[in-house]
Amino acid sequence: MRSEQTPVLIVGAGLAGLTTALFLGQHGVPAIVADRHPGTANQPKARGQSPTIMEAFRTAGVADAMLAAAPPGRPEMTIVICDSVTGTVLHSYSEHFPDFAALSPSPGGLASQQAAEAAIATRARELGADLRFRTVLESLRQDDDGVTATLHDLGTDQRYQVRAAYLVGADGGRGTIAAEAGVGHHGRGAFGHVRTVLFRADELIEEVPDTAILMYYVQNPGLPAGSASFVSTDHRGEYVLGINDDLDRTDAEVVELIRIAVGRPDLKVELCNVGSTWEVAHRVADRFSAGRVHLVGDAAHLMPPTGGQGGNTAMLDGMHLAWKLAAVVRGDAGPALLDSHDAEQRPYGQTIADWQYVNMFERLQPDQRPDDLPEVPDPVQGLFGYRMASRAVVGGADEYGFELPTGRPGTRAPHVVLHRGAELLSTRDLFFAGFVLLTEDPAWADAGQRVAAELGVPLAVHRIGAELTDDDGTFRSSYGLSDDGAVLVRPDGVVGWRSTTIADPATLDAAWRRILDR
């Protein structure tokens, strides 16, 4: 059996796995990505990218493709509860996409998952990722030095081994890697299955408006479980029906269910793709890391789709994990840095899964709302206010929580508008490629350069008031700094350390070494 080596093997080429590969490439580390499917998503699936991940995509060269893939002229999402798409409307409301300009320089994206996966895959390949579709993981074995995986190429029917320093489990909610690594799950359980069907019905073009992104929740006793979802796509005349069970049906039976959901018994339907089923569930891994195996995406946290944060959380998992893997693989950091993946991402994944679970009742089943719903942050704090607590944060809080950015270690580095000559940019545009030191003090700038050279770790030093100007005078207050302070921002845009005192290279050296497990 042939054998090959790679620094990182990623199993699963959905949003989580592809984003991990993308940012590993951004940090100079190639990865092999294996996925059992023929290619990236062949249905629209989820839609939307939060400003927080879009900021990172700007630096990685993906944001423009995401924005270009959004359906034009749709500034809002309309949700309709009805007995059929063309029938009686029981309730409807529109959600305008909020303006987060005070918190982020990036607009949110509205690309479908299908378009997003394709864009990320293209850029990941450009940055060195080796994507292998129709490839199945058959076994894995880890030891103190790495992971050995047996892969099966379904196209050639050949089996081969890959030896990797680390394995990323991005194989979804039905994946096997978590169990093989000895990781259990907990949560509120499963609520059912959905089969998604992509179809074309030109007769609906005049009846279903394209001025908004539309989602219909159809309540009709003629449908499985008495309900279905109907969603517009990027293409006029194409729609997706979500059937609430996992039964196999003939094409004629599927067409009949579409007609019931639409309310048109004579509707002409062209089936484009009868997709596989997926599970609606609330389930979170007990650990996100087990030895040299690290979980991301649905493999780590499966959540109801109500709220649209499953994909965003998956992409954030990949971005946050990638810089840590890259730092360890390159020798910039010790292996214990990777312990922070579980310490930082598991509480966040749990919170977002809880949030989507609460949404499921508040939006769809308010009369069945259980008494023990978990407390969740408001949406703005959920997107922008997560406070991490781990050894990769120095001088922060002892426990995770939620607070809007203030420059406190463990929180998102605040967005401040700066000028570089005539160019406007954000502090957030300076991040995601490596460590960054922000300061107004030339002594701290010099200290940063010296410490980086001693550690052998790349550092971008930006002096506010020198090459970058703070014309609005908000940098210092936004970051909680004095005129002789400094902040060290990690490659994921999180404040790793902050000082409000005069320059002291030894203090920076000690803090940075702790972050990196050096």
Where are these regions (language model features)?
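A conserved short coil-to-beta-strand element within the FAD-binding core of flavoproteins
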Residues: 133-148
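FAD/FMN-dependent oxidoreductases across multiple families
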Residues: 249-309, 313, 348, 352-356
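Glycine-rich FAD pyrophosphate-binding loop
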Residues: 25-46
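Core beta-strand elements of the Rossmann-like FAD/NAD(P) dinucleotide-binding domain
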Residues: 4-6, 156-166
